[in-house]
């Protein structure tokens, strides 16, 4: 049963990638408190990993520099709740930045080679999935 729910979660995440969709990214601030903000997923491999694009000098990047623990949540009015917990890192490799670039980012950055632009790579360690009134908990 977990495999079926995990596959459905991966399909939902795939549908929620790009500039038009959002999820909630929770990080730990400099004082040790949780913070949550909406962000678009640029790419994903099911529930295994997700990437986000943001500014290197922004608050998200600063928080990740201090603490690489994070959670991601996708939710739709009772239809599903996908919560992933894991680690997150800042990636500035030019090839990765180019691969993760999407058109919506041009409102914030001059291009994939903009030094202010970075990629955040989230890797799931554990999950809590609730889809079609079925729940799956586990670790990867």
Predicted regions and their residues:
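Histidine- and/or cysteine-centered catalytic micro-motif in compact active-site loops
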Residues: 28-30, 40, 55-57, 75-77, ...
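A short, Trp-centered hydrophobic/proline-enriched beta-strand micro-motif
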Residues: 15-30, 70-74
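Short, surface-exposed beta-edge/turn micro-motifs
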Residues: 20-22, 48-50, 67-70, 115-117, ...
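A short mixed-secondary-structure module that forms the rim of ligand-binding clefts
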Residues: 42-79
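Charged, gly/pro-rich active-site loop segments
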Residues: 1-4, 83-140
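Short, basic and Ser/Thr-rich N-terminal targeting/leader segments
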Residues: 19-21, 34-37, 82, 113-116
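Extreme N-terminal tail/first-helix region
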Residues: 1-23
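N-terminal leader/targeting helix
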Residues: 21-48, 52
């Amino acid at each position: 049963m977990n495999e079926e729910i995990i596959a459905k979660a991966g399909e939902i995440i795939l549908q929620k990638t790009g500039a038009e969709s959002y999820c909630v990214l929770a990080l730990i601030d400099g004082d040790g408190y949780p913070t949550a903000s909406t962000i678009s997923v640029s790419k994903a491999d099911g529930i295994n990993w997700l990437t986000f694009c943001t500014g290197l000098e922004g608050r998200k990047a600063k928080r990740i520099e201090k603490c690489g623990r994070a959670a991601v949540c996708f939710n739709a009015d009772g239809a599903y709740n996908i919560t992933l917990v894991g680690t997150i890192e800042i990636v500035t490799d030019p090839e990765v930045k180019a691969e993760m670039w999407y058109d919506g980012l041009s409102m914030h950055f001059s291009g994939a080679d903009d030094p202010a632009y970075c990629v955040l790579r989230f890797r799931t360690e554990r999950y809590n999935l609730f889809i079609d009134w079925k729940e799956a908990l586990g670790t990867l």
